[in-house]
């Protein structure tokens, strides 16, 4: 029998019989690897263990410890769930069921709604099917054969998918009596699906189109073992406890109202104070770094949006209004007014770089189905800046922004990850401009000394970019800072400066945000801190609590003194038990409760008590002011 040569990840070569599969290769390396293998990579493509090898292929064996393992496990768990649903609810029609970042889902068309009790039944049946150790097999059928197969099963959604693929052949995966249209790959048998949990039910339109039929989506998750699953479920419970929508109500920070409109935030006094603190912090930090604060109008003429390209490419996400028979666009971003500021004067190379910063409120039409508390809204404020500089200044400006981001993330206690997205196939601008911008971004990233990923071809059509994702207390990733080079707007708006040689040249433009949308960042902060904001960020830093009504006059004087000193303080002078008032303040996550009783009134002091129950020594009100100033001095 002839043999073929296979390249392994360590660079070694291995001879194996022609016609062998990836499973055969794993077995030839060792019994332990054969047992651990769940899939393979053939020339960089994730495939089943049953895939036949080719000569001179590069092969990697995927085990449960591999980064790609969860994708395969979760995809197979989605099929297992669909199989269980079909057995328990034969009338259900299956549609699509992919693996996603945190688990998997499957969409079903069924008249009767699924209930929480149904999820328990489905999960129990999944466990039985997994224990049955059914072999998962892949077949390649002609499209006509596949249409015949799924038509016979009454699965009209699968028939629609096959017809839309317009391919000569398709792959079908089977386990027991269940078959599904799928590219794979999958585990070799159902017994390899060992730890899973069904989580929730939601609605979803077929193919994401609101004009199509509403389906029922079941979400679940799966892991390699029960320990990992339990850890994830614990994090999930913790994320529910930290949910900013719940905490926003409980802490009286913000609300939404159908009478006002979907995705439009109403900030209550404490939420507005939190936002004000954050915005004041942003202004100070930008001024320290040489930015000029600017403000643009909320609406701009439609012709300006046409000139910028937004009308052509972004119109569906914009809101428009008519004023004196003139059409205006409500701004979805802040850049156009900044362009007009630049154009208001003839610029010299000596003026550059110019850094325009605006806490600009924008409006974007997001579909109702994707709105989510503060994290996805229709009206929001960005810490938006545009840097206009000479090409030779670009490298230094990018490094400055990355240092800015690093400083700010450290203040809030966030770790973060960075990604560089390079030129896509469809792009504008000449090669030299792209090379200059990409090299500047790459150089700045390397200069940080931190690791980063490169997403080849994932940049915007008008320039490369750096995306920065922060990691919160639950190790979740959130997009925040972005640094984006733009070759389009300087060209469209004919931005120029007079260079040292007297020639007019085009400046380089950088869009950048540090926190991103203020609303979204506050939502992330609420969940990161679980509402326990650090002292400098807390909308209420201290709560004065009296023991009896006799202490109210003294407490009123202390309240006024603290407010005059700039402390954000409130008073609870109700005729309630002290323990009740302290508990109320703790539930509101106020950092300090200042107890005032006979002893404090006689000695003209207050007794601070931290929200975790720890008491400080009694002190004069002015000493408490000094204490707060010292604790927050780095953020004022």
Curated annotation (Swiss-Prot):
Binding, Zn(2+): 335, 386, 511
Note on how the cofactor is bound: Binds 1 zinc ion per subunit.
GO annotations of cellular component type: cytosol
Subcellular location, record wording: Cytoplasm
Stretch list, region Catalytic: 243-534
Catalytic activity, as annotated: tRNA(Thr) + L-threonine + ATP = L-threonyl-tRNA(Thr) + AMP + diphosphate + H(+)
Named cofactor requirement(s): Zn(2+)
Subunit structure: Homodimer.
Full protein name: Threonine--tRNA ligase
Gene giving rise to this polypeptide: thrS
């Amino acid at each position: 029998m002839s043999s073929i040569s296979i390249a392994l990840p360590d660079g070694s070569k291995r001879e194996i019989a022609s016609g062998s599969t990836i499973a055969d290769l794993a077995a030839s390396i060792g019994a332990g690897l054969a047992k651990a293998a769940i899939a393979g990579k053939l020339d960089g493509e994730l495939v089943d263990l049953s895939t036949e090898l080719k000569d001179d292929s590069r092969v990697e064996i995927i085990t449960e410890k591999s980064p790609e393992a969860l994708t395969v496990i979760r995809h197979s768990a989605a099929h297992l769930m669909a199989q269980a649903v079909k057995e328990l609810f034969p009338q259900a029609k299956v549609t699509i069921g992919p693996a996603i970042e945190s688990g998997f889902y499957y969409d079903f068309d069924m008249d009767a709604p699924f209930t929480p009790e149904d999820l328990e039944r489905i999960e129990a049946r999944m466990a039985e099917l997994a224990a049955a150790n059914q072999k998962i097999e892949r077949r390649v059928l002609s499209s006509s054969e596949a249409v015949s197969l799924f038509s016979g099963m009454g699965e009209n959604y699968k028939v629609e998918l096959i017809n839309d693929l317009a391919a000569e052949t398709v792959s079908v995966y089977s386990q027991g009596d269940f078959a599904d249209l799928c590219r794979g790959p999958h585990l070799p048998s159902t017994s390899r699906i060992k730890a899973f949990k069904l989580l929730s039910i939601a609605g979803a339109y077929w193919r994401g189109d609101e004009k199509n039929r509403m389906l029922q989506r079941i979400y679940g998750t799966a892991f390699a073992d029960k320990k990992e699953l339990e850890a994830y479920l614990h994090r999930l419970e913790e994320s529910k406890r930290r949910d900013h929508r719940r905490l926003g109500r409980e802490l009286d920070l913000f609300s939404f109202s159908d009478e006002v409109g979907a995705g439009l935030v109403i900030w209550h006094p404490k939420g507005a104070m939190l936002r004000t603190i954050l915005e004041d912090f942003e202004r100070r930090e930008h001024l320290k770094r040489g930015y000029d604060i600017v403000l643009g109008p909320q609406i701009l003429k439609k012709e300006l949006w046409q000139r910028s390209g937004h009308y052509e490419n972004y119109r569906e996400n914009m809101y428009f209004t008519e004023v004196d028979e003139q059409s205006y666009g409500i701004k979805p971003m802040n850049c156009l007014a900044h362009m007009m500021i630049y154009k208001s004067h003839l610029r010299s190379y000596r003026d550059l770089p110019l850094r325009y910063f605006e806490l600009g409120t924008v409006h974007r039409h997001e579909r109702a189905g994707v709105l989510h508390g503060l994290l996805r809204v229709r009206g929001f404020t960005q810490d938006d800046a545009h840097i206009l500089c000479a090409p030779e200044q670009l490298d230094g400006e990018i490094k400055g922004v990355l240092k800015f981001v690093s400083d700010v993330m450290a203040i809030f206690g966030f770790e973060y990850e960075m990604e560089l997205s390079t030129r896509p196939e469809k792009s504008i601008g000449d090669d030299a401009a792209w090379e200059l911008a990409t090299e500047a971004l790459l150089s700045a990233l390397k200069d940080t000394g931190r690791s980063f990923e490169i997403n080849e071809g994932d940049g915007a059509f008008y320039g490369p970019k750096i995306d920065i994702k922060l990691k919160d207390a639950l190790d979740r990733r959130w997009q925040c800072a972005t640094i984006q080079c733009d070759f389009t707007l300087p060209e469209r708006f004919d931005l120029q400066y007079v260079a040292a040689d007297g020639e007019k040249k085009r400046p380089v433009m950088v869009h950048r945000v540090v926190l991103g949308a203020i609303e979204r960042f506050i939502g992330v902060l609420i969940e990161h801190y679980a509402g326990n904001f650090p002292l400098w960020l807390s909308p209420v830093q201290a709560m004065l609590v009296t023991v009896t009504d006799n202490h109210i006059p003294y407490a009123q004087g202390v309240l006024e003194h603290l407010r005059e000193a700039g402390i954000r303080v409130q008073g609870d002078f109700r005729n309630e038990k002290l323990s009740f008032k302290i508990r109320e303040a703790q539930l509101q996550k106020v950092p300090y409760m200042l107890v005032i009783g006979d002893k404090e009134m006689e000695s003209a002091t207050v007794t601070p008590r931290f929200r975790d129950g720890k008491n400080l020594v009694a002190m004069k009100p002015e000493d408490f002011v000094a204490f707060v100033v010292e604790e927050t001095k780095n953020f004022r």
